Amino acid sequence: MSERSYYDILGVSKSANDEEIKSAYRKLAIKYHPDKNKGNKESEEKFKEATEAYEILRDPKKRQAYDQFGKAGVGAGAGGFGQGAYTDFSDIFGDFGDIFGDFFGGGRGGFGGGRRSGSQRGSDLRYNLEVSLEDAALGREYKIEIPRLESCGDCNGSGAAKGSSPTTCPDCGGSGQIRRTQGFFSVATTCPTCRGKGTTISNPCKTCGGQGLQEKRRTINIKIPPGVETGSRLKVSGEGEAGPNGGSHGDLYVVTHIKRHELFERQGNDLILVRKITLAQAILGAEIEVPTIDGKKAKMKIPEGTESGQVFRLKGHGMPYLGAYGKGDQHVVVKIEIPKKITRRQRELIEAFARESGENIPGSKGKIFTK
C-alpha cells in the first residue's frame, strides 16, 4: 500500500489555501487529541500524523519543497535544498498555540506537555549534502561545517552568572506548566513566568544572555557509504544541538541529493549509458570499450547487424546496493552515428554497396563528401 500524502491525511486538495488547511487540522486535532482519547493508541497516532502534515503544509517553503520532492525533501523546519542547508527538528507540537488556543483557551494542549524543568535533550539538525554519482557509487568521506547551539562555557549551560544559580519558578513549582481543566480536557499551558523552563534566573550570564547556549560552527567528517541515493538519510548521533540546562546533544541527519551526471543516468541501482558507434561497426560487428562509473573501461561486443537503439547489458557494473552485497547492471544504448561528410572514395563504395543490395540510388548533386 502506498504511503498517504499529507493532503490525504488532512482531507484537503493540493490547491487548498491556508484557511482550509488550518480548518481541516483543527477538526482532526479536536477529534483525536490524546487528552480526549486517553489510552487510545490509534487516536494518538492519527493525532501525530495530522500534526506532522499540518506542520509541513502550513509553511509555504516546506509545502513547496514537499510538492516538489515529497517527504525525502522535507523535515521539521526544512529550509531548502541548497548545499549545506540544515534544519532544526524541534518538537513539532510546540508551534501550534494558534490552533489549540482557539478551542483550549490559549497555550499548548496536554499532548507532549511533560515536565519542563531540568536538562532537556537538544534539537536534531538536518544537513542537505550534494553528492556526485561517482561518490555515491564508491563511497567517500565529506567534511561539512554546521552552525549549531552548544552549551555556554562560562555558565556550563545553566544560564546564570558565575557565583549564582537558577531558582525554582514560584508560579509553576518547577514544572514549567500551568495546568487547568475544561470539561473533559486537561490543558497544560506554558508557564508565562519561566517560559516552560521551571526555573528563573535573577543574575543571567553575560556571555549567553541567560540562555545557557551559544551558536558555534562545528566541522564534522561524514562517511557516505556506497549506494546512497537522493533522499538517503544518514544519522550522526550526538551531533545535533545541545540541550537546555546542560542537556545532551540531539542528532544530525545528513540527507543526500545526487547530482546529475553528464554520461550516466541512474535508474534505481542500474545505470544507463548512451554509446555512439560507427556505421561500419554496426554492420560488421566490433569490440568496443565503454566507460563505467568506477572510472574504468569495460569491453563490449557489438554483433553484426546491430541496430540503432539496441541495448546491451554489462552485468554488475551498476550502482552498489546500499548496506548489502552486489551491484546493479549497466545498460548501454548504442546509437549509430551517420557521418556528415565522406570522401569521394567512401561515396563510391557506398553506392556500389547500394547497387549490390538492389537499391536504385540516383547520383547526388549535394556536397556531402570531402576530397
From Swiss-Prot:
Q: Where are the CXXCXGXG motif repeats?
A: 152-159, 169-176, 191-198, 205-212
Q: What GO molecular function annotations does the UniProt record carry, in alphabetical order?
A: ATP binding; heat shock protein binding; unfolded protein binding; zinc ion binding
- Look up the record and give one Gene Ontology term from the biological process aspect: chaperone cofactor-dependent protein refolding
Has the keyword NAD been applied to this entry? Answer: no
Under the cellular component aspect of Gene Ontology, which terms does the record hold?
cytoplasm
Q: Which Pfam families match?
A: DnaJ, DnaJ_C, DnaJ_CXXCXGXG
- Start and end residues of each CR-type zinc finger? 139-217
Where do the annotations place Zn(2+) 2 binding? 169, 172, 191, 194
Checking InterPro entries in the record gives:
DnaJ (IPR012724), DnaJ_C (IPR002939), DnaJ_domain (IPR001623), DnaJ_domain_CS (IPR018253), HSP40/DnaJ_pept-bd (IPR008971), HSP_DnaJ_Cys-rich_dom (IPR001305), HSP_DnaJ_Cys-rich_dom_sf (IPR036410), J_dom_sf (IPR036869)
The J domain covers which part of the protein?
Answer: 5-70
On whether Cytoplasm is a keyword of this UniProt record, the answer is: yes
Q: Which residues does Zn(2+) 1 bind?
A: 152, 155, 205, 208
Which keywords does this chain's UniProt record carry?
Chaperone, Cytoplasm, DNA replication, Metal-binding, Repeat, Stress response, Zinc, Zinc-finger
Cofactor annotation remark: Binds 2 Zn(2+) ions per monomer.
Cofactor list: Zn(2+)
Q: Subcellular localization, per the record? A: Cytoplasm
CDD domains per UniProt: DnaJ, DnaJ_C, DnaJ_zf
| Biological function | Participates actively in the response to hyperosmotic and heat shock by preventing the aggregation of stress-denatured proteins and by disaggregating proteins, also in an autonomous, DnaK-independent fashion. Unfolded proteins bind initially to DnaJ; upon interaction with the DnaJ-bound protein, DnaK hydrolyzes its bound ATP, resulting in the formation of a stable complex. GrpE releases ADP from DnaK; ATP binding to DnaK triggers the release of the substrate protein, thus completing the reaction cycle.
User: Which family does the entry's similarity section mention?
Assistant: Belongs to the DnaJ family.
Q: Sorted alphabetically, which HAMAP family does this protein's record hold?
A: DnaJ (MF_01152)
Subunit structure as annotated in this protein's UniProt entry: Homodimer.
Print the domain comment field. The J domain is necessary and sufficient to stimulate DnaK ATPase activity. Zinc center 1 plays an important role in the autonomous, DnaK-independent chaperone activity of DnaJ. Zinc center 2 is essential for interaction with DnaK and for DnaJ activity.
Record-given protein name: Chaperone protein DnaJ
Species name? Leptospira borgpetersenii serovar Hardjo-bovis (strain JB197)
Q: Which gene encodes it?
A: dnaJ
